[in-house]
């Protein structure tokens, strides 16, 4: 399903009305390899590996100058209201692959760069990197979905989600909520 520009525009008020704190986790995903997805009931998050078994450690899209994976992209969080708009389990396009999906306001105003988030027993730090809805997002969910993410005034809303580094190892479960602990 590729949403129309009109559907995306009409959904914006609903997306922006998401909880500003204590957002429930609605989906967990691990990517063992490109275009592979598994949906466990919990994820282990570590500073050293991101999510053990996830492709971030071996095949990240961004690396440090020394070749190591950039820790600022260890974990991505996507708003569940956006996911519901662009993807359904019956779609032929794969799930976007964000490890955590939650009903939470991910905007820059709500979660400025550097904000610490308690996610289960783990702590994540919101990255300054903008998740712009890469080529895969456009191919899977349509050019309208990509254009919507980067439209004037939209980048600060972080409609494609946020990128985070693991600050403290821990575990996140489907029953957890995401809470702001600083920022």
What are the roles of these predicted feature ranges?
Residues 1-183:
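Metal-cofactor-dependent catalytic cores
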């Amino acid at each position: 399903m590729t949403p129309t520009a009109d559907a995306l525009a009409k959904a914006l008020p609903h997306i922006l009305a998401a909880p500003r704190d204590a957002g429930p986790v609605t989906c967990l995903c691990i990517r063992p390899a490109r275009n592979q997805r598994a949906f466990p009931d919990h994820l282990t998050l570590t500073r050293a590996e991101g999510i053990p078994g996830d492709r971030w450690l071996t095949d990240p899209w961004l690396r440090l100058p020394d070749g190591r994976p950039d820790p600022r992209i260890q974990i991505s969080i996507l708003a569940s209201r956006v996911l519901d708009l662009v993807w359904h389990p019956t779609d032929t396009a794969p799930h976007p692959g964000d490890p955590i999906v939650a009903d939470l306001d991910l905007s820059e105003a709500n979660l400025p760069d550097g904000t610490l988030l308690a996610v289960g027993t783990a702590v994540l730090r919101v990255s300054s990197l903008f998740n712009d809805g890469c080529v895969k997002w456009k191919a899977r969910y349509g050019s309208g979905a990509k254009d919507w993410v980067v439209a004037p005034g939209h980048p600060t809303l972080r409609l494609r989600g946020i990128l985070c580094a693991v600050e403290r190892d821990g575990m996140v479960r489907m029953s957890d909520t995401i809470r702001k602990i600083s920022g």
